[in-house]
From Swiss-Prot:
It catalyses: a ribonucleoside 5'-phosphate + ATP = a ribonucleoside 5'-diphosphate + ADP; AMP + ATP = 2 ADP; dAMP + ATP = dADP + ADP; dATP + AMP = dADP + ADP. It is found in: Cytoplasm. It comes from Oryctolagus cuniculus (Rabbit). It holds the Pfam family ADK. Residues 38-67 are annotated as: NMP. This is Adenylate kinase isoenzyme 1. Its EC number is 2.7.4.3, 2.7.4.4, 2.7.4.6. Disulfide bonds: none annotated.
């Protein structure tokens, strides 16, 4: 099973809040048959499952602490192993947020094939998030919080992009355009992997 993961196509998907990376991931799953894994979704699913690990996670998150990297990686690996036979590849969404997370992923799971950087400017992301806030009811979609989230995102992501750029596996997608325009750029990069 470990061998299968080492041979699998693994794509880290990085993009700011409001960059549209969630939408792009959905489209990739639909067209290419990849498995979309979001660390946030995995954590939430584990907590609501009521498992021993879920209970521990719930306590950590309630205290506002960060979930240990080891736990996140265990969950990612479990999810990947479960799909290794049927999946055409894996989209790892919102990970790594730090260089160390990327290094640990490689040590414990496998090397990424590509890092897909869904890149939209801060004004675009802010506009999209404010628009989403009108309908989503998400508490973190207001102007003040959005500015903070974008700052945090840029600080965390720049070193990660730089780290993988040195290896030549970053594929940048201009996410300013329409969903379809962005997706056609994504397809160009993914088709080149075959």
């Amino acid at each position: 099973m470990e061998e299968k993961l080492k041979k699998a196509k693994i794509i880290f998907v990085v993009g700011g809040p409001g960059s549209g990376k969630g939408t792009q991931c959905e489209k990739i799953v639909h067209k290419y048959g990849y498995t979309h894994l979001s660390t946030g979704d995995l954590l939430r699913a584990e907590v609501s499952s009521g498992s021993a690990r879920g209970k521990k996670l719930s306590e950590i998150m309630e205290k506002g602490q960060l979930v240990p990297l080891e736990t996140v990686l265990d969950m990612l690996r479990d999810a990947m192993v479960a799909k290794a036979d049927t999946s055409k590849g894996f989209l790892i969404d919102g990970y790594p947020r730090q260089v160390q997370q990327g290094e640990e992923f490689e040590r414990r799971i496998a090397q990424p094939t590509l890092l897909l950087y869904v890149d939209a400017g801060p004004e675009t992301m802010q506009k999209r998030l404010l628009k989403r806030g009108e309908t989503s009811g998400r508490v973190d979609d207001n102007e003040e919080t959005i500015k903070k989230r974008l700052e945090t995102y840029y600080k965390a992501t720049e070193p990660v992009i730089a780290f993988y750029e040195k290896r030549g596996i970053v594929r940048k997608v201009n996410a300013e355009g329409s969903v379809d325009n962005v997706f056609s750029q994504v397809c160009t990069h993914l088709d080149a992997l075959k």
